[in-house]
Amino acid sequence: PSSAFNSPFCTTNSGAPVFNNNSSLTVGARGPVLLEDYHLVEKLANFDRERVPERVVHARGASAKGFFEVTHDITHLTCADFLRAPGVQTPVIVRFSTVIHERGSPETLRDPRGFAVKFYTREGNFDLVGNNFPVFFIRDGMKFPDMVHALKPNPKSHIQENWRVLDFFSHVPESLHMFTFLFDDIGIPQDYRHMDGSGVHTFTLINKAGKSTYVKFHWKPTCGVKSLLEDEAARVGGANHSHATQDLYDSIAAGNYPEWKLFIQTMDPDHEDRFDFDPLDVTKTWPEDILPLQPVGRLVLNKNIDNFSNENEQLAFCPSIVVPGVYYSDDKMLQTRIFSYSDTQRYRLGPNYLQLPANAPKCAHHNNHYDGSMNFMHRDEEIDYFPSRYDPVRHAEKYPIPSTMCTGKREKCVIQKENNFKQPGERYRSFTPDRQERFIRRWVETLSDPRITYEIRSIWISYWSQADKSLGQKLASRLNVRPSI
């Protein structure tokens, strides 16, 4: 910061002393305010611009800092430096969030929760940008803007309405699995400390020999998963609409540090055809009895952020930010997010958002990305191109990336193994009877919206009947709709 921050008296942004920070410059005691009062103009102009645009999703959130520590050796799977050996610690910043609702909205609403981790590794940052649920609503990013529009408030009234949500998703049967999480008891986490996290997508690990392995990341809280039922959520949210943010902050301040264990599931890409689903389908989970959870490390949050604007609002996560040893897969939704997230950060924070302290790597870094809006990196080099015989900068040592052969014709199509109903049915049947009853009640209430047509109601009953026949029958009976299957 500027030395002006150490001044015993107020100054302007340029450092000039301010002898009266309470009164405007006027013509006499009661006269008009003068435009030449530069300090007033500067103060108001700064105030008018002190909020960056709200995130289009994940606007409501809370951040904390800490470390990730490797506890188990997985160097046979990846050459990632931050996973090089047990005991290695990497500083992190984590942001939890709700997804659909606005900044400042209650943290007790039924909504997925974001779980994003930025690792400041010795080989650059790694952003693992996930949610608390292991699946997603859609598998192709082409649908993403429409999906968010449907989940967001009505553009005419600015009221979030169930009929819009169920109308859109009546065209998207792949969403059923996600709804078995969202409409389940875990649809409203008790707070951020008591919820799972997931990388959601299938990623790729690459070892030193260049062998690729599909991977899914899972965070498990050491204090267990706890959720709120509707009456509890109404009571908690009515008393404090920022209860989860306060719980996170107060717990860390008291030395009760939240901790999660990191587990992975891995799959040999050569074995992907052995399953009745596509392993790159983000609407599917991998069976843990066949692909068991393997421990990797632990995440500990032991420091609250110092400034909400700098370390929460200006904090930017992008799934495109990976490190050697970790790579993407051909998951269509992940491929879309690789572009979309960095693009929205450039809109929200400016083209140099990665220079902001919370987003900048903590390791040495160099490139020729110069100037532009909001650039504040002081550089005095004469060489701003590559290569050059006047500059010793060279290529880094080569590291392995996936070498999969891609063949096929250009086409817009759905994946072959959609299998939209099996996993939702299995998950519903895993619920206890009282949990099933609460799930049914939530769907009956939602499908009873007066603007939902008989056709849409029938489609949803058909979908749930294909997932589980008894579930469809119960919904049809309570809604007085004849099941079509």
From Swiss-Prot:
GO biological process, one term: hydrogen peroxide catabolic process
Binding-site list for heme: 341
Predominant place of localization: other
Gene3D superfamilies named in the record: Catalase core domain
UniProt-listed InterPro entries: Catalase, Catalase_AS, Catalase_clade1/3, Catalase_core, Catalase_haem_BS, Catalase_immune_responsive, Catalase_sf
Active site (record annotation): 58, 131
EC supergroup of this enzyme: oxidoreductase
Gene Ontology molecular function: any one: heme binding
Protein name: Catalase isozyme 1
Organism from which the protein derives: Nicotiana plumbaginifolia (Leadwort-leaved tobacco)
